[in-house]
A protein has these predicted regions:
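Charged, amphipathic alpha-helical segments
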Residues: 104-107
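Aromatic-rich beta-strand edge motifs centered on tyrosine
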Residues: 36-40, 66, 111-115, 137-139
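N-terminal helix-cap/turn-to-beta initiation motif at the start of protein domains
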Residues: 9-23
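Central antiparallel beta-sheet cores of small beta-barrel/beta-sandwich binding domains
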Residues: 27-102
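Edge beta-strand at a domain terminus
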Residues: 83, 88, 93, 113-143
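Periodic aromatic/glycine/histidine/acidic cluster detector
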Residues: 33-36, 109, 121
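A short, compositionally biased
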Residues: 20, 68-70, 115-116
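Bacterial N-terminal signal peptides
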Residues: 1-4
Length: 143
């Protein structure tokens, strides 16, 4: 599998993330982590993520994959706050790496399909040290 910089010949689109549409769920210790993604339409995919611990939502995030200015970008809004732009840095058919080196943390957001699993990762420098958090999820029925 080739993984390289995004080239002008075959720019990825939101259609390449179609496999992500639907509902995903995993565990982080005692917490349940969920992401729900729409099907691609209008050069955009809309998503919602939340983490529930002890029957309480402890974090949530509105998200988009959007084609902007000829580039695919990941646009999260943690806790419903200000939107942050992470342009696509590199991709393959099953792995998409979005990067914003000017963001505090994370600087990279990675979505990867591994067989039937979704592995979503955030990584970068935090307090002067490299940090990586991985969220492994399975596709579940949307309610």
């Amino acid at each position: 599998m080739f993984l390289g910089p995004v080239s002008g010949q075959s720019k990825p689109t939101v259609e390449d993330l179609f496999w992500l549409s639907g509902c995903w769920q995993g565990r982080q210790g005692t917490a349940v982590v969920e992401e729900m993604w729409s099907k691609p339409a209008g050069s955009t995919m809309l998503g919602l993520g939340r983490t529930v611990r002890n029957n309480r939502t402890v974090s949530f995030e509105f998200m988009q994959f959007r084609e902007q200015d000829g580039t695919l970008a990941f646009l999260p809004q943690p806790q419903g706050g200000a939107q942050v732009k992470f342009p696509l840095k590199e991709s393959s058919s099953a792995r998409f790496v979005f990067e914003n080196l000017n963001h505090d943390f994370p600087q990279r957001v990675i979505y990867e399909r591994k067989n039937s699993l979704l592995v979503a990762s955030i990584e970068g420098t935090q307090n002067g040290k490299f940090s990586r958090h991985e969220f492994v999820m399975r596709k579940v029925r949307c309610n």
